[in-house]
Amino acid sequence: MNSKTKLIHCGRGDQNVEVRSVNPTLMRASTILFKDHATWQKYRELRKTDRVLSYGARGTTTNFELEKLICSLEGGYRAQLFPTGLAALAMVLLNYASKDAHFLITDAIYEPVRTICELFLEKMGVEIDFLKADASDVEEKIKPNTKLILCESPGSILYEIIDLPKLCKIAHSHNIPVAIDNTYSSGYFLNPLELGVDISVIAATKYLSGHSDVTMGVVVINEKEWKNFDKLPEALGFTTSPDDAYLVLRGMRTLDVRMKAHEKSADEIVEFLQTRKEIKTIFYPKLKTHPNHEIFMRDHKGANGMVTIEFAEGYSKEDAIKFVDELEYFSIGASWGGYESLATVTTPPRTATDWSKRGPFVRFHIGLEDTKDLIADLAKAFDSIKK
């Protein structure tokens, strides 16, 4: 089944009944009731292998339908919802954490992951090393006690690209699982499990929801690495609201048309940006000048609405701030993946690569507005800082 068809037909409840609603039922429940003790015990046993009703904190049928849809889209064995994307990443890290374990994390990883490492993992005795953003130095950084490689590709500021099949081949030769933050592609433009990745993490907050009104994360995992993932949310008290699950299900029905619209608009905006002398570098993976562009085009079905610019020499951070403040249709906000356009002055948080002497940078999320309006808005803002 094509991904476009999966988005419409998967995760819609029991399709074998004679009469049903087009959407799955929204089930809110903290307590699940059983007809007798034997039934209660039966479902407590079933939940070890299946997603069944057993306890509200472990999810309701609404949650399960969303998990089925995302799992089908990503081609995984199982999926597990979390209240935020960061919580999902934290669970992946905790699942492999132990005293004297060694983790490799790529430099473009979502910045708060570094805080998890500092506040929790290092105190537990986990050793952390950061790879180059493209993971090109992975082989030389692997140690006998390396238990996990966590990457993000493309990165969410400069869109660094990793050769995932190559990375996975190296990692698996050392029996090391590979996890990826796949939020950029959101299971639609890239299917990392097909390329050898073991665990895919998506912030459903962004494109899966698509309407900037939900926070949620999801872990999609292959059968080999599933192990205790289903126990982690309940053990640590993580649960996901069925109302939020319902909203993400609704958002995902239009994921295909939204992603294509974001990409088309981003293409048009990038074409305009290439005419501006105020810009030194445009970071957009579809550009032939983008590092590892060929790998991106080989593995991805498209690009999302993310574009970053680096201003030319002579422009200061203050100029970048004035530029962003002059924008009318680009709001200032830290997230992305919704229907609206955003612009933020940013600095790539890196340790393996030094970007401190580069910039200033502005990251855009190209929303679903008319691109003629967006281009006119950008032109006006550029003119306000013209040298």
Segments (PLM) and residue ranges:
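Short conserved active-site loop signatures built around small residues
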Residues: 1-27
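Conserved PLP-enzyme active-site core in the AAT-like
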Residues: 7-15, 78-278, 283
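Glycine-rich beta-alpha junction loops
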Residues: 11-14, 28-35, 206, 254, ...
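Conserved N-terminal alpha-helix of the aminotransferase class I/II PLP-enzyme fold
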Residues: 36-87, 113-119
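Short, solvent-exposed beta-strand edge segments and adjacent coil->beta transition regions
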Residues: 50-52, 214-216, 302-306, 359-363
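PLP-dependent enzyme catalytic core of the Aspartate aminotransferase-like
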Residues: 118-119, 127-129, 315, 326, ...
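Short, well-ordered beta-strand elements within core beta-sheets of diverse protein domains
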Residues: 248-257, 305-313, 362-367
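Conserved small-domain helix->loop->beta segment predominantly found in fold-type I
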Residues: 267-328, 334-337, 347-356
